[in-house]
Amino acid sequence: MAKLTLITGGAKSGKSEVAEDMYANEHGVCYIATSVIRANQDSEMKLKIKKHRQRRPADWTTEERYKDVSIFVLMNDYQKYLLDDATMMTTNLFFDLVAKMYNDFPGNVDEDIEQMNKDEIESIQTTILQEFSKVVDSLQRTDQEMTIVTNEVGLGLVPASKESRILRDTYGLVNQLLAKKS
């Protein structure tokens, strides 16, 4: 029977390590890292990714991707998957979808987001939710197990920028979907 576990908490709360510890003595684990190093990425993020890589057991498989996770799960048969994390996957999908919507590669995505109307925002949110639904469906179809790490969001002030508000709301929608399915 397929199993989905959701681990949530604040930024830097240790949730990734908790998830890794759950599978520490397991073999056949595939770690799906949703933050991928890009050419223009800042050194702080590169260091964070490096630390995460170093923490993983040597016999785990690492798959760095945030797109087509459901297809990857359907095409493979690992005993367990650890997806770290849904928030980064959402962020990456969001910026890809905005750039695609405005044919703006690499472009100025910040300006594009400021121009977005309600229908465009809802369209992107729907697409992102569909991606996560496909991941859950792929687990059910293959009877596999996955733990997903995600950030708790929305407990503080209302973000000042439109971009931050859209992302906060999108993270919340993703977390609702995953919580219902886990």
Predicted regions mapped to residue ranges:
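Phosphate-binding/switch region of NTP-binding enzymes
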Residues: 161-182
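Catalytic-core regions built around general acid/base machinery
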Residues: 130-143, 174-177, 181
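A solvent-exposed, charged loop/short amphipathic helix patch at secondary-structure junctions
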Residues: 98-124
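Conserved, surface-exposed functional patches that form binding/active-site neighborhoods
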Residues: 80-106
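Short, solvent-exposed loop/turn segments at secondary-structure junctions
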Residues: 90, 155-162
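Acidic, metal-coordinating catalytic segment for phosphate/diphosphate chemistry
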Residues: 151
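Conserved P-loop
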Residues: 2-75
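Loop/turn-to-beta-strand initiation segments
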Residues: 77-80, 142-147
